[in-house]
């Protein structure tokens, strides 16, 4: 339903983004809204159980962030000494994380109002894949509401656990840094069992309108391309509509599927003689 470059070429999308940015500049209640998201409504439900694991959507040209732009929290398995010492002493990762903490210490030190402060202090949370499933209980609903600060899953090394063998504890700083760079520069989505997806595509005062449009098109291309499965190609039944918004703004349309337009395309194709 949405062909390649439809969004970039769409005058409606550009107008909507200009109007949205103007809203945020003029409306005092929106002055702190910086993230720009698209809301994608699909023809069919995705049929994927929500697991609270963000999936990366590669952006071809315009990065969202660099690791140094963000305050990043790393949550490790216990004990955390190996990971903390390796990452803080290695030149590739010494300034990558604002804090490194184990699950046990996280549970012990942060409760109630301290969890709220933790939420405010960090822009991004990443966790060792071996403890990621424990975090909804430890971090609480604040981090998981609206998917704004869901922890990303990373691996501390390329080591793979073999059956009946204990996994050797290793920490590879270069591999950790590569994962962080990918998380920061690209965008992501959370699979669900609904027919609606929200994806961040830009940041006010950081990305221009043409850059945001390109990021939107990259997102649509990835989510509709079946060759990108299982990470991509998750949209079923085509795209019905796309809206753009910030956290507190109204939703502005940038794409609406037109059955009449689709029928016209089919009629045009039927006139072609082979």
UniProtKB/Swiss-Prot annotation:
Q: Where in the cell is it found?
A: Nucleus, Nucleolus
Query: Which InterPro entries does UniProt cross-reference here?
Result: eL8/uL1-like (IPR050257), Ribosomal_uL1-like (IPR023674), Ribosomal_uL1/biogenesis (IPR028364)
Return the similarity comment.
Belongs to the universal ribosomal protein uL1 family. Highly divergent.
Q: Which GO terms describe its cellular component?
A: 90S preribosome; nucleolus; nucleus; small-subunit processome
Q: What highest taxon heads this organism's lineage?
A: Eukaryota
Q: What else is known?
A: Present with 3060 molecules/cell in log phase SD medium.
Look up keyword Ribosomal protein and say if it applies. Answer: no
Q: Supply one GO BP term.
A: ribosomal small subunit biogenesis
Q: Which UniProt keywords apply?
A: Nucleus, Ribosome biogenesis, rRNA processing
Name of protein: Ribosome biogenesis protein UTP30
Q: Name one GO molecular function term.
A: RNA binding
What's its job? Involved in rRNA-processing and ribosome biosynthesis.
Q: Report the Pfam families cross-referenced here.
A: Ribosomal_L1
Q: How does it assemble?
A: Component of the 90S pre-ribosomes. Interacts with FAF1.
